[in-house]
C-alpha cells in the first residue's frame, strides 16, 4: 500500500451541474442538487477511486464512474450525467463564466472536507525528503507564493519543521538520484496539475514536484495515471510518487 505524507491542503468536494437559467430550447437543466427529493433522481459523474465516488456511493447516489475529474465534467456537459462531484479547487478553476465549462455552475452543497498529501511507496525515505522540502518551502514563503499563483492559498495548512532521514538500506531517494529522474504520477486536475499552451505541466502540485526534483538534483517526469491503479503504479516502480490530491485516508 501507499504511505501518505503529512497534509498539504484542506480540500472540499463540490457538486457541479447545469445552470438553471439554460434556455428552454437547449438541453433540460439539472434539478437543484441541494434538494434531497431531487438528489435521488440525479446521476452524478465521479472519478473512479476518488473521495467523490466514495461520498456519492455512501449517500446512495446514482453514479457513473470515469477515469478523471475532467471527464466527470465532460459527462455533465454531454448530458450523460446531471452533475459531477469533484474537488472544489478544480471546480473553481474549470466551472463558470470565463472557464472551460461556462454553462455549468457550482452548487452550494458541501459534501465533505478532507486533508490531502502526497503518496510514496510504503516505508520510502522519499516521504521524509518531501516533508523536509515542504517544511522549508513553507518557512521561506515559497509554498504560499506558489499557492497564490494558482489561487489556492486559502486551502494551505501549516507545514511543521521536518528533517530528512535517509533509509539505511533500500533508499528510494538514492534510487531516484541514481536513475536521474523523479517520475510523478498525476491526473489532469486544474489548478493542481495541468498543461500550459506549450504542453508543459504546471499547477500548484506540479510546481511543488518540480521543486522536490530540483532538490534531489534530478529531472521531473510527469506521467498521467489511472487513479484507481495508483498503488499498483507505485509498487511496480512505474512511478516514484503520486502527487495529485491524494486523501490522507487512501
Predicted regions and their residues:
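Extracytoplasmic small-molecule ligand-binding "clamshell" domains
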Residues: 25-34, 59-65, 75, 87, ...
Amino acid at each position: 500500500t501507499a504511505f501518505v505524507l503529512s497534509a498539504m491542503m484542506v480540500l472540499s468536494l463540490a457538486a457541479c451541474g447545469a445552470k438553471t437559467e439554460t434556455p428552454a430550447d437547449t438541453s433540460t437543466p439539472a434539478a437543484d442538487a441541494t434538494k434531497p427529493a431531487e438528489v435521488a433522481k440525479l446521476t452524478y459523474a465521479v472519478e473512479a477511486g476518488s473521495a467523490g465516488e466514495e461520498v456519492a456511493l455512501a449517500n446512495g447516489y446514482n453514479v457513473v464512474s470515469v477515469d478523471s475529474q475532467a471527464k466527470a465534467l465532460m459527462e455533465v456537459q454531454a448530458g450523460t450525467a446531471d452533475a459531477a462531484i469533484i474537488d472544489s479547487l478544480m471546480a473553481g478553476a474549470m466551472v463558470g463564466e470565463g472557464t472551460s465549462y461556462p454553462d455549468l455552475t457550482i452548487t452550494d452543497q458541501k459534501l465533505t472536507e478532507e486533508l490531502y498529501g502526497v503518496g510514496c511507496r510504503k516505508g520510502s525515505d522519499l516521504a521524509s525528503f518531501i516533508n523536509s522540502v515542504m517544511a522549508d518551502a513553507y518557512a521561506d514563503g515559497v509554498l504560499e507564493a506558489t499557492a497564490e499563483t494558482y489561487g489556492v492559498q486559502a486551502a494551505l495548512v501549516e507545514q511543521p519543521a521536518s528533517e530528512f532521514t535517509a533509509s539505511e538500506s533500500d533508499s528510494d531517494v538514492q534510487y531516484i538520484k541514481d536513475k536521474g529522474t523523479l517520475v510523478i504520477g498525476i491526473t489532469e486536475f486544474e489548478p493542481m496539475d495541468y498543461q500550459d499552451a506549450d504542453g508543459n505541466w504546471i499547477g500548484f502540485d506540479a510546481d511543488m514536484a518540480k521543486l522536490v526534483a530540483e532538490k534531489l538534483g534530478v529531472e521531473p517526469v510527469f506521467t498521467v495515471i489511472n487513479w484507481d491503479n495508483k498503488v499498483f503504479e507505485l509498487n511496480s516502480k512505474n512511478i516514484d510518487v503520486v502527487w495529485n490530491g491524494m486523501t490522507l485516508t487512501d
